[in-house]
């Protein structure tokens, strides 16, 4: 019986052993070489070999079922299993190629968020197409599948409203692009501030400034305001200089000197608003407003530029013989009778 089995399926057995040998040789060859060479050709050839092996094995099993009158299984079941295995392998290979494409786009400098959303949309499309083709292959009508999908979608929607809300909000985040991975964001409505680490289908992961992970449901972003300081073009420097009242005669000169210093400062963006004006009589000081923008948006560089501006302001004030005011009170005493000398 075994001899007859081998004789009648010699071609299938040769195909199986030859395909397995080809897989082993391919794996050995690519393991010795560069892993980056596992591109479209590698996966296509590997998928073809897997398909040949599965088809040959299925053919042998069907031969055994038909010739030995096996009752516990039918050729239709074997065809279903083989087709399912081929569909799963095809899906895996396509997903691997999509992941490689996504990594290549990111390495080329493309936006991470855009690359990921395109990758996920293509994966979802592949799954839907394969399910429809798979069902049609086994005699299910396309209209029936779509009707079943609509009813199932309605049931899932009613049972998982919050999940679907997060899902569709995640899609809108990808298309509206209020922020991208790596952006610093914060919300004045909620206690949310940090760097965007990941935008998922259901939640967005934010790393706070003390390196704690914060997971925010995507649906929340549709009902709150989100500020994206990471996309600002400049950073602002604003402060108030308080001079003493006895330095009133020097205020105008100091204002002009500070304004000139800012106009010539290499870190200050001259295309943006630059204001230096005496603007307030305070209780203990004559206040000068300073308002300008740096060219950089990097926090550390902005702090260095702001420090340099402040130090130069101190030098200007002191070089003009003036000084900074501090809260003080002056007590005037008039017509005071000295106490009588004790006898």
Curated annotation (Swiss-Prot):
The keyword Transmembrane helix applies. InterPro entries: LSM_dom_sf (IPR010920), MS_channel_1st (IPR049142), MS_channel_C (IPR049278), MscS_beta-dom_sf (IPR023408), MscS_channel_2nd (IPR006685), MscS_channel_C_sf (IPR011066), MscS_channel_CS (IPR006686), MscS_channel_TM-2 (IPR011014). The lineage of its organism: Bacteria, Pseudomonadati, Pseudomonadota, Gammaproteobacteria, Enterobacterales. Pfam families: MS_channel_1st (PF21088), MS_channel_2nd (PF00924), MS_channel_3rd (PF21082). One of its GO terms (molecular function) is mechanosensitive monoatomic ion channel activity. Belongs to the MscS (TC 1.A.23) family. It comes from the Bacteria. Keywords: Cell inner membrane, Cell membrane, Ion channel, Ion transport, Membrane, Transmembrane, Transmembrane helix, Transport. Coiled coil: none annotated. The chain crosses the membrane at residues 10-30, 41-61, 78-98, 126-146, 148-168. The gene is ynaI. One of its GO terms (biological process) is cellular response to osmotic stress. It comes from Escherichia coli (strain K12). One of its GO terms (cellular component) is plasma membrane. The keyword Transport applies. Mechanosensitive channel that protects cells against hypoosmotic stress when highly overexpressed. Residues 31-40, 99-125, 169-343 are cytoplasmic. This is Low conductance mechanosensitive channel YnaI. Its main location: membrane. It is found in: Cell inner membrane. Homoheptamer. It is a multi-pass membrane protein. PROSITE patterns: UPF0003 (PS01246).
């Amino acid at each position: 019986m075994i001899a007859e089995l081998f004789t009648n399926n010699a071609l299938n057995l040769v195909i199986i052993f030859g395909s397995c040998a080809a897989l082993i040789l391919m794996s050995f060859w690519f393991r010795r070489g560069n892993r980056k060479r596992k591109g479209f050709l590698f996966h296509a050839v590997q998928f073809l070999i897997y398909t040949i092996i599965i088809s040959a094995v299925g053919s042998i099993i069907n031969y055994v079922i038909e010739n030995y009158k096996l009752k516990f299984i039918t050729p239709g079941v074997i065809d279903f299993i083989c087709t399912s295995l081929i569909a799963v392998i095809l899906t895996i290979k396509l997903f691997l190629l999509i992941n490689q494409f996504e990594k290549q786009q990111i390495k080329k400098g493309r936006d991470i968020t855009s690359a990921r959303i395109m990758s996920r949309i293509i994966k979802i499309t592949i799954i839907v197409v394969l399910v429809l083709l798979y069902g049609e292959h086994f005699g299910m009508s396309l209209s029936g599948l779509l009707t079943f999908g609509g009813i199932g979608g309605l049931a899932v929607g009613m049972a998982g409203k919050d999940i679907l809300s997060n899902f569709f909000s995640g899609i809108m985040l990808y298309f509206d692009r209020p922020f991208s991975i790596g952006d610093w964001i914060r919300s004045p409505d909620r206690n949310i501030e940090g760097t965007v680490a990941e935008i998922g289908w259901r939640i967005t992961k934010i790393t706070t400034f003390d390196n704690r992970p914060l997971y925010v449901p995507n649906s929340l972003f549709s009902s709150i305001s989100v500020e994206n300081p990471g996309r600002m073009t400049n950073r602002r420097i604003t402060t108030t200089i308080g001079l003493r009242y006895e330095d009133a005669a020097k205020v105008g000169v100091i204002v002009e000197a500070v304004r000139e210093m800012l106009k010539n400062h290499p870190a200050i963006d001259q295309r943006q608003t630059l204001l230096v004006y005496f603007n307030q009589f305070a209780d203990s000081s004559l206040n000068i407003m300073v308002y300008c923008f740096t060219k950089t948006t990097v926090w550390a560089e902005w702090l260095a530029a702001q420090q340099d501006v402040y130090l130069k302001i101190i030098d200007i004030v002191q070089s003009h013989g003036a000084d900074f005011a501090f809260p003080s009170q002056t007590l005037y005493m008039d017509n005071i009778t000295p106490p009588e000398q004790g006898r």
